Amino acid sequence: DVFAEEKEGIPADQLVDHKIAVVGITAAVNPGVGIKDISKENLIKVFTGKITNWKDVGGKDQKIVLVNRPDASGTRAVFNKFGLDGATPAEGITEDSSNTVKKIVNETAGAVGYLALSYFTDDKVNPLSIDGVEPTDENVQSGKFPIWAYEHSYTKGEPSGATKEFLDYLMSDDVQNTLLKDQGYLPVTKMQVERDAKGNQTNK
């Protein structure tokens, strides 16, 4: 979920980055909170504890319950960087897995967490649009929806032999358009934008 350059102790200058897939992420709320869209400004206020009741963002009169992933989570790193613009979330419930986050948000009145888009397969939790932009595959691929990240494979130097063959296989149409989607990822080959390690986004 993160670039090698973002992790301390990794010799990123010796590695070659192969971006093989994309994951979109958005805030997930308990269906009872009563909202489907939130501004990024208010999303940041919710997760930093400056807004503590859903009625303040057009929802029900319910206390907001934050559900976070651990500090080491790639999903958390991506959500904090692109959803919260680098702000540090307030303390809340911390769960190790996305499946558990979904379960807790579903079972807890007023709860909000964050999940990859592939977890929104039923009505147990609701995905939030941000500033009116829905968290769809198409909006991630066009760059309209802001919270997404690459899945990386790194090699020490340029790949060769079986390693290169495997990476070529991962970039093939069969994998990009079928296998990745089955696993809940978006094909990197369909992205209309790209990002660098600093988070700068440009059109391809």
Predicted regions and their residues:
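Exported/periplasmic ABC-transporter solute-binding proteins
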Residues: 1-204
